[in-house]
Amino acid sequence: MPKRTDLKSILIIGAGPIVIGQACEFDYSGAQACKALREEGYKVILVNSNPATIMTDPEMADVTYIEPIMWQTVEKIIAKERPDAILPTMGGQTALNCALDLARNGVLAKYNVELIGATEDAIDKAEDRGRFKEAMEKIGLSCPKSFVCHTMNEALAAQEQVGFPTLIRPSFTMGGSGGGIAYNKDEFLAICERGFDASPTHELLIEQSVLGWKEYEMEVVRDKNDNCIIICSIENFDPMGVHTGDSITVAPAQTLTDKEYQIMRNASLAVLREIGVDTGGSNVQFAVNPENGEMIVIEMNPRVSRSSALASKATGFPIAKVAAKLAVGFTLDELRNDITGGRTPASFEPSIDYVVTKIPRFAFEKFPAADDRLTTQMKSVGEVMAMGRTIQESFQKALRGLETGLCGFNPRSSDKAEIRRELANPGPERMLFVADAFRAGFTLEEIHEICAIDPWFLAQIEDLMKEEKAVSDGVLSDLDYAALRRLKRKGFSDKRIAQLLDVKEKEVREHRYVLNLHPVYKRVDTCAAEFATETAYLYSTYEEECEARPSDRKKVMILGGGPNRIGQGIEFDYCCVHAALALRESGFETIMVNCNPETVSTDFDTSDRLYFEPLTLEDVLEIVRTENPWGVIVHYGGQTPLKLANALVENGVNIIGTSADSIDAAEDRERFQKVLNDLGLRQPPNRIAHNEEEALVKAEEIGYPLVVRPSYVLGGRAMQIVHSAEQLQKYMREAVQVSEDSPVLLDFFLNNAIEVDVDCVSDGKDVVIGGIMQHVEQAGIHSGDSGCSLPPYSLSEEIQDEIRRQTKAMAYALGVVGLMNVQFAVQDGVVFVLEVNPRASRTVPFVSKATGVPLAKVGARCMAGISLKEQGVEKEVVPDFYAVKEAVFPFIKFPGVDTILGPEMRSTGEVMGVGASFGEAYYKAQLGAGERLNPTGKIFLSVREEDKERVIKTAKNFQALGYGICATRGTAQYLTEHGLIVQTINKVPEGRPHIGDALKNGEIALVVNTVSSDPQSVSDSHIIRQSALQQRVPQYTTTAGGEAMSEGAKSRDHLGVYSVQELHGRLKNRS
């Protein structure tokens, strides 16, 4: 059956901001779906609140709305655009829940819109824990013993039936939000309370624990004629009890017999049929008891998921693209497989002749108070994938791709008690402690007994440890061609071999080159080399035949950003994708190097050639040797490729764009100071210190408060504001080992200054400003965590012109070719330069969406020698509307972590709001970030002494909107003196009823809480912020944020929806 002709336009719902449990894999699937449906002639309408996505580029859909993903907003878009159908399976849990809300609130019926890809009933049956269990029993598959509960009494009764440890799973959530494993009654009550809050239907599944069972996933695609194929099987290295998003996973499954695999395959197809997923991709999770082989179904997702992005990258089969086409009526046998150039139909099950390993990336260093033990609630922020011909090779490649300083199984501890603890209670580095256990003399049986990891995986690591021991007992010259090749085939990096031999990495590399030992590159082709493939999707391995077949065209190689993490996220991937697209359009052959399976950059048709490899010097140099590119771009992948810049230049690689020396001039304090002095620009007073005594002496010279940080950081890692010599001493003792042979930087902190971000692009001759963004939060909050407005909402034209002049002067002085980002602080009308980054910044996608100028593309062409004039980019575009970017935080996943913002970045994602006024844009950005302001209730204010004057306007704005105002004693007294009617409310230590009670009783609509720097007032008010977080009450830890929300709330009853195409069209007509 060919495609449906009764549908003309289709609305795709995106996944919104990047949060833990839902990352950029949905940008990848949504972008594929847009392309697939437009290819077939459908009009595609897209809604997604995240500006840092490729799918929200104006070219991806016919009409694009960067608006909050909530049913009320989507209804306005439906009323305006009148789509025939909605495809809700491309945007993760957010899109599914939004689609169900549209159905429940009668919107789909009112406008006669059909759900395609998954019916309301199928979504409900898969996501509703009780219905799912009934469905499984009906087809003879068992689930863990479990009970669906809607009240705490029901939950307690269910727990008695299933016993401890007990698993708690909320309905309709993703990333295991709100769930957990309870080992006693107190834990059980706490997790249930959290779970009821997290579930939109106030429903929990109380389930028997299958801790220690083996976990598997099947990625399945089905069409309307009931053709079903398995894309790939995935096995978890970690047994049940760790969320699959936090587990190391391996594809294809390694420890199933063929018979077991066939049983699981048949079961997964039966699950899809019973749930009613008629078309598209789904993933089904199983647990197998290692004692007797008993198999149970854990859950299924009736949509493309994190696992399907992994399966797509692991096999080369574009699940999201195929699922989108199946949703409009195609069948699998009618679709061709792109990767084989159409030689095979999409109904061929992929077959793979290599092993894929995925390892999650965590960011616990950003949340020291968080519990870093892994359970059923997901905590990782990114992931890395590697391919090899053996499990050992792909595992070790994945470890070095993580960029946590590993180059293999680096030792972590030799203390047997600590090793035992780490094996028994999984944390982010359990696999390293397995290796340590073998080093410390544990037997395979003992290790298996403690951690329940399958003995087959343990045997692989044991073998690697024997190899390590043999290497460290010898010297480099012992490693002849055969010996070194054996190590390389098992995935050992030059750097790890160097550590074992106590020599430099360079010596091992030179020795290997003398032996003429190099990797070859194999192709990912979905068919285990049965058919020839034109698609250059490659991974390295140490074998005989190389399948790279490089061309002799003029090539540019783009180094990607590696795994997502806080401080380096999807924004950098966005820039890499744009570089590849722009340079392809300009006639270059583009080569992408990256190892992040969630991203658009690792899609095989984004660039001409894709190398799925770790971003280490060894791996990059080998690709350069094979491809011999004309130029390499290191400026677009964040800190990851920048760290390689100098070493690449030393090895004769041509880095195009801003030179490595200029990057160093901007990053190196002393050199940068000289640049600013020569230009006559101001910096906050600053000093450099190499040790504690020097720091204390220099701090006295400048005066407190100070911002202290190590040099060369991204995301404000280990950056703090200190107010006294005691705090500085503590910082120097606890945080200073952050960067090797790098001193600590001390800057005078500009209190209550306005921070400003500027992105610009230069071709070496001309400089064009991309956008000037005024931060909402004052200087001292990391720029990645601050809301910002383009154009500025309160900076005078004179100040903006001065900022433009200074930006251009620095771009010329540093010899920038490509993109540059500058952060300024404005205090009492004086402009200070805080820092300059001559590279792509995280605001580039936002600026591009707000102005219609694709900065990353323009910058990439500049690097390749195409001038701004030739590109027709000669003047700054200032929008005639407001665009506001807001950060999204993962605090709800880390109970106990304080929500106070500071100079260390902690947000995982961002949203954008657009409006005719700053207030409207800011309010929509807050909605996009998940903040919901109740239309009634009280506004609670509790601010430090210096903020009291600033909070008067906020109180007046909210009072005018009909809210009551309540405040703690000092703030209430101050506001009353200034003519406001305020109810005084107790702080928690002052006795009951206190603010914690008012929050729990649902009396408070919004919290503004700022604290002075002394630890006592921070800990006294911690409970206010925690209660607000748990009750989902919007809270602001800066007066600026509270004031902006009070302005925004004025326009909440008349919010418009604006498409990117109509906004950009307006700007083009104006110019």
UniProtKB/Swiss-Prot annotation:
Mg(2+) 3 binds at residues 823, 835. One of its GO terms (biological process) is 'de novo' UMP biosynthetic process. It is an enzyme of class 6 (ligase). Its cofactor is Mg(2+); Mn(2+). Mn(2+) 1 binds at residues 285, 299. The gene is carB. Residues 404-548 are annotated as: Oligomerization domain. It holds the Pfam family CPSase_L_D2. This is Carbamoyl phosphate synthase large chain. Mg(2+) 1 binds at residues 285, 299. PANTHER family: CARBAMOYL-PHOSPHATE SYNTHASE [AMMONIA], MITOCHONDRIAL, CARBAMOYLTRANSFERASE FAMILY MEMBER. Its EC number is 6.3.4.16, 6.3.5.5. It comes from Neisseria meningitidis serogroup A / serotype 4A (strain DSM 15465 / Z2491). GO terms for molecular function: ATP binding; carbamoyl-phosphate synthase (ammonia) activity; carbamoyl-phosphate synthase (glutamine-hydrolyzing) activity; DNA binding; metal ion binding. The large subunit is composed of 2 ATP-grasp domains that are involved in binding the 2 ATP molecules needed for carbamoyl phosphate synthesis. The N-terminal ATP-grasp domain (referred to as the carboxyphosphate synthetic component) catalyzes the ATP-dependent phosphorylation of hydrogencarbonate to carboxyphosphate and the subsequent nucleophilic attack by ammonia to form a carbamate intermediate. Residues 1-403 are annotated as: Carboxyphosphate synthetic domain.
